[in-house]
Amino acid sequence: MTTRTNVRRSAAVLLVAGAAAGATVLTAGTAGAMPTDFHCTSGQVTSRLVYGGAGAGGRDAAIQFTARSGETCTLPGALPIDLVGAHDVMLSSDAAPDAPSVEISDGSSAYIPLHWTAIGSPQQQTPLAITVTAPQETSPRGDTSDPRITLPWNLGAVNAAPESHTIRTGATTAGTAPTV
């Protein structure tokens, strides 16, 4: 009977040890995994204004977002954008409400195109800054950040005449912003 009891005990110990090891592997794999479809926070990206060129009185630029090292997140196809200063200049989005999201990770980029006119010096205004509201405040790791991304406007004056006083914004696009 002693042999039978020892075999049962050994089998029970091995069963419990195997279950514990399997549970450890499963929870370790789950804890290390991050969601891949998580909206970006301002802390997960660097942002900058990129000059895109000029022609026939029009100006082009972009707001470029680059994922920080080790970060993966998704930017919606349309993001809320506002101007600081230049009270007669409006923003108008050409992005469809259902524009596709763009995933960025580990140094990859996405941008929002901007277009405006800069003719008529007596009726021009220069914004102080442009702000974008990130879609998320808390990262998958639990880090929180202010959702507002404020970029100083360094792209010169914008037409503020009533007939042409709008900066048009486009949908979030994968890749680096085009430059001249």
Report residues per predicted region.
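Low-complexity, acidic Ser/Thr/Pro/Gly-rich terminal tails and inter-domain linkers that flank the onset
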Residues: G32-G55, G175
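Intrinsically disordered, low-complexity Pro/Gly/Ser/Thr-rich segments with frequent PxxP/GP/PP motifs
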Residues: H87, S93-G120
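Short, surface-exposed binding/anchoring microloops in extracellular/periplasmic proteins
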Residues: T46-V84
